[in-house]
């Protein structure tokens, strides 16, 4: 995924998961929404985000993608995947307690974000050899 915003969202989300992991009163859940023409559910991006969450949370150790007909277990991250309308893509993470809720949301408004990211990556990789991730591209911009 070549979205600059999503890459930054992933970094913010990782930090938030590490911080909020210390507060047992907050449960963690996530969801994604995409247009009704998208064939995969969950999306590759949602799968990547779920992996990041599990890698940085000591309380969540598995993802449940399907509909639940029971209470989620404490170690389960329930990640909902919705399809409908014309939504290019929205991914959200929620830390919820009895007292309050904190939500992090990234919404693609235009597919031009992917073109912008691809062009930035092409400029960045010029003269380099090897295999790189888009996260490495963004990492250099943040240094």
Show which residues each predicted segment covers:
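A contiguous active-site-proximal alpha/beta segment in oxidoreductase catalytic domains
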Residues: 1-32
């Amino acid at each position: 995924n070549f979205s600059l915003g999503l890459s930054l969202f992933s970094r913010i989300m990782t930090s938030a998961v590490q911080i909020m992991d210390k507060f047992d009163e907050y449960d963690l859940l996530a969801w994604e929404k995409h247009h009704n023409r998208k064939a995969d559910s969950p999306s590759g991006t949602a799968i990547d985000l779920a992996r990041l969450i599990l890698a940085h949370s000591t309380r969540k150790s598995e993802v449940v993608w399907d509909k639940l007909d029971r209470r989620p277990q404490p170690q389960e991250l329930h990640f909902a995947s919705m399809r409908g309308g014309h939504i290019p893509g929205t991914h959200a993470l929620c830390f919820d307690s009895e007292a309050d809720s904190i939500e992090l949301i990234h919404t693609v408004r235009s597919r031009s974000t992917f073109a912008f990211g691809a062009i930035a990556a092409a400029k960045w990789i010029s003269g380099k050899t090897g295999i790189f991730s888009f996260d490495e591209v963004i990492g250099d911009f943040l240094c």
